[in-house]
Amino acid sequence: MLNSFKLSLQYILPKLWLTRLAGWGASKRAGWLTKLVIDLFVKYYKVDMTEAQKPDTASYRTFNDFFVRPLRDDVRPLNTDPNILVMPADGVISQLGRIEEDKILQAKGHNYSLEALLAGNYLMADKFRNGTFVTTYLSPRDYHRVHMPCNGILREMIYVPGDLFSVNYLTAQNVPNLFARNERVICLFDTEFGPMAQILVGATIVGSIETVWAGTITPPREGIIKRWTWPEGEHEGSVALLKGQEMGRFKLGSTVINLFAPGKVNLIASLASLSVTKIGQPLATSTETFVAPEVEPAPLPAEEIKAEHDASPLVDNKKDDT
């Protein structure tokens, strides 16, 4: 009965209005009130503040500052084996496995369309048919920055407007086509393991979705699909990210979906639905063997990533193929 009531609220409540209100409140500096809200949040969700660079909740000026808090460098060691792709986010695996032609598993008894997830882009969908997917759910207590599973060259980004359903276990089990209905940002990369898509899915109360190369993608929510492209390789204007480097963030929790081309990676055998994920830990192995360079570049430190994020031009300065 309680679950039925919660599901009914998902359809009845003004999710966009609530999300805008939450985003507005989370960005305000309110002194002692901000600290009180953060303290209550930490206690209720059992957030481990010992992992944060700033464990003192009084050091955060806004709730958003707290929510995208950086972690200490030593708490998420990166697996540097060049044949291993690593987990992109802290959270729990919702589902993972093979993409069956155009079908991706959402929950037991529920599939959704690969092409619908990619906003009808059949050319992009063709890259991943019969490939591999991993869906990672970030709960409110988790670290909410998203990192790269491997080195990648950004080729395309698509903003897809949509609903703002919650993306927790209950809704994943009961709301059809959940991830293909919700607002999302699709990022396509060229990698040593073939094309890879990393998709940031919005949800109720998710105030914004950001990337390190473009800043805030949403809001504003204009209600139209927008597309940007970048050059390949080392051409001027290209965006290259390293394995383990931050690529985006959520302000309040949501979901990350990774898509891999067929025959390119094998998921770690011990992973299953509800497996806990930690950034930098093994997610998949290559079907080919790569040899590490003599000196492998390390991910940028948090301070340099922040400076790069702040200095990056807005997406409006990129090639917009809307």
Swiss-Prot record:
The feature of type site (Cleavage (non-hydrolytic)) is located at: G253, S254
Disulfide-bonded cysteine pairs: these are none
Which modifications occur after translation, per UniProt?
Is synthesized initially as an inactive proenzyme. Formation of the active enzyme involves a self-maturation process in which the active site pyruvoyl group is generated from an internal serine residue via an autocatalytic post-translational modification. Two non-identical subunits are generated from the proenzyme in this reaction, and the pyruvate is formed at the N-terminus of the alpha chain, which is derived from the carboxyl end of the proenzyme.
Write the record's keywords in alphabetical order, separated by commas.
Cell membrane, Decarboxylase, Lipid biosynthesis, Lipid metabolism, Lyase, Membrane, Phospholipid biosynthesis, Phospholipid metabolism, Pyruvate, Zymogen
Query: EC number(s) of the enzyme?
Result: 4.1.1.65
Q: Where is this region: Disordered?
A: 297-322
**Protein biosynthesis listed as a keyword:** no
Q: Where is the composition biased (Basic and acidic residues)?
A: 303-322
GO MF annotation: an example: phosphatidylserine decarboxylase activity
Its annotated pathway reads:
Phospholipid metabolism; phosphatidylethanolamine biosynthesis; phosphatidylethanolamine from CDP-diacylglycerol: step 2/2
Q: How is the cofactor bound?
A: Binds 1 pyruvoyl group covalently per subunit.
User: So where's the catalytic machinery, residue-wise?
Assistant: D90 (charge relay system), H147 (charge relay system), S254 (charge relay system), S254 (schiff-base intermediate with substrate)
* Cofactor(s) it depends on: pyruvate
Q: Which residues carry this modification: Pyruvic acid (Ser)?
A: S254
Q: Where in the cell is it found?
A: Cell membrane
Q: Top EC class per UniProt?
A: lyase
Q: Which domain of life is it from?
A: Bacteria
**Membrane topology qualifier:** Peripheral membrane protein
Q: Which reaction does it catalyse?
A: a 1,2-diacyl-sn-glycero-3-phospho-L-serine + H(+) = a 1,2-diacyl-sn-glycero-3-phosphoethanolamine + CO2
What's any GO biological process attached to this entry? phosphatidylethanolamine biosynthetic process
Q: Which family, according to the similarity comment? A: Belongs to the phosphatidylserine decarboxylase family. PSD-B subfamily. Prokaryotic type I sub-subfamily.
Q: How does it assemble?
A: Heterodimer of a large membrane-associated beta subunit and a small pyruvoyl-containing alpha subunit.
What is this protein's function per UniProt?
Catalyzes the formation of phosphatidylethanolamine (PtdEtn) from phosphatidylserine (PtdSer).
**Which protein are we looking at?**
Phosphatidylserine decarboxylase proenzyme
Which species is this record about? Answer: Salmonella typhi
